[in-house]
Curated annotation (Swiss-Prot):
Function: IF-3 binds to the 30S ribosomal subunit and shifts the equilibrium between 70S ribosomes and their 50S and 30S subunits in favor of the free subunits, thus enhancing the availability of 30S subunits on which protein synthesis initiation begins.
Entry protein name: Translation initiation factor IF-3
Keywords from the UniProt entry: Cytoplasm, Initiation factor, Protein biosynthesis
UniProt entry tagged with the keyword Cytoplasm: yes
Similarity-based family: Belongs to the IF-3 family.
Compartments it resides in: Cytoplasm
Region (Disordered): 1-22
Principal location: cytoplasm
Keyword Repeat (UniProt): no
Length: 182
């Protein structure tokens, strides 16, 4: 982008000043080819950038004198945006998966739910275990506590219990998270 382009005020523009936005009298200049040009006055550096048809972009404002590079500002912003998008893609949102049990859940169903729970934890998600009581089962809450203890024992040391089993209305709730890998 040549020097005559207008500056659009965005939060990103505040990070890297360019051309006339640079206010310091002397800057260390890196050429468009990546070679060190040296310490020049701001006006000399701007003239050199204009001569090449590029922008003078402040790369390290905290340095003494600040480091500026002669480059195409639009291309520079595009590359920064691309890097930010790549970093954003690599981060994974932790989801909370919910599995519902009953105090009298059959062995086959229990094993399937346990296998799913292991898979969710391996993927890095948290699991909310919900043990529901129906009718007179509420008078046998110890069965729910035994079920929660069995789940904890079957999953082994690969987990962190974020919240111990607690009664919420007619259901017992427990939160399980995967253990952080070092």
């Amino acid at each position: 982008m040549p020097l005559g382009d207008c500056n659009i005020s965005t939060p990103d523009n505040k990070q890297n000043r360019k051309n006339q936005e640079i206010r310091v009298p002397r800057v260390r200049v890196i050429g468009s080819d990546g070679e060190m040009v040296g310490v020049l006055s701001r006006d000399e550096a701007l003239a050199k950038a204009e001569e090449e048809g590029l922008d003078l972009v402040e790369i390290q404002p905290q340095a003494d004198p600040p480091v500026c590079k002669i480059m195409d500002f639009g291309k520079f912003k595009f590359e920064q945006q691309k890097k930010a998008n790549e970093a954003k893609k690599k981060t994974k949102q932790v989801e909370i998966k919910e599995l519902k049990f009953r105090p009298v859940t059959d062995e086959g169903d229990y094993q399937i739910k346990l296998r799913n729970m292991r898979r969710f934890l391996e993927e890095g998600d948290k699991v909310k275990v919900n043990i529901r009581f129906r009718g007179r089962e509420m008078s046998h809450q110890e069965l729910g506590r035994e079920m929660a203890a069995r789940i904890e024992a079957d999953l082994g040391d690969d987990i962190v219990i974020e919240s111990r089993p607690r009664l919420e209305g007619r259901q017992m709730v427990m939160m399980i998270a995967p253990k952080k890998k070092v």
